[in-house]
Amino acid sequence: MPTINQLIRIERKAVLKRKKTPALQACPQRRGVCTRVYTTTPKKPNSALRKVARVRLTNGIEVTAYIPGEGHNLQEHSVVIIRGGRVKDLPGVRYHIVRGTLDTSGVADRRKSRSKYGAKRPK
């Protein structure tokens, strides 16, 4: 416990909160170019081949981003937009690719939650 005099001399340090999406630098989304598109396996109780992409952002930072939805058209040099949002069973994946923008197509034959996957309204 510090004395009053010690607190006057040196004030208390505020506890700094760690940012969940540092690469976005306080922007809602960021544009980037895919440098590698691949699949990876999730953490222990789960089993799958999750589609992810390594993306170099316009601010020069390179991050791993998840490709949501079934099927995608991404390859190396595709221009994408990423948003925040981690994938719980993929360590190190803290970003999602936005479907239906730039070079990313929307999910085909999607009927529910269409706006989240960039799918047009079915006729």
Swiss-Prot record:
PROSITE patterns, per database record: RIBOSOMAL_S12
Molecular function GO terms recorded: rRNA binding; structural constituent of ribosome; tRNA binding
Xref: Pfam families: Ribosom_S12_S23 (PF00164)
Modified residues (3-methylthioaspartic acid): D89
Gene Ontology CC, one term: small ribosomal subunit
Record's keyword terms, sorted: Methylation, Ribonucleoprotein, Ribosomal protein, RNA-binding, rRNA-binding, tRNA-binding
GO biological process: translation
Matching InterPro entries: NA-bd_OB-fold, Ribosomal_uS12, Ribosomal_uS12_bac
Purpose of the protein: With S4 and S5 plays an important role in translational accuracy. Interacts with and stabilizes bases of the 16S rRNA that are involved in tRNA selection in the A site and with the mRNA backbone. Located at the interface of the 30S and 50S subunits, it traverses the body of the 30S subunit contacting proteins on the other side and probably holding the rRNA structure together. The combined cluster of proteins S8, S12 and S17 appears to hold together the shoulder and platform of the 30S subunit.
Subunit structure: Part of the 30S ribosomal subunit. Contacts proteins S8 and S17. May interact with IF1 in the 30S initiation complex.
Family: Belongs to the universal ribosomal protein uS12 family.
Name this polypeptide is given: Small ribosomal subunit protein uS12
Species of origin: Desulfovibrio desulfuricans (strain ATCC 27774 / DSM 6949 / MB)
Gene name per UniProt: rpsL
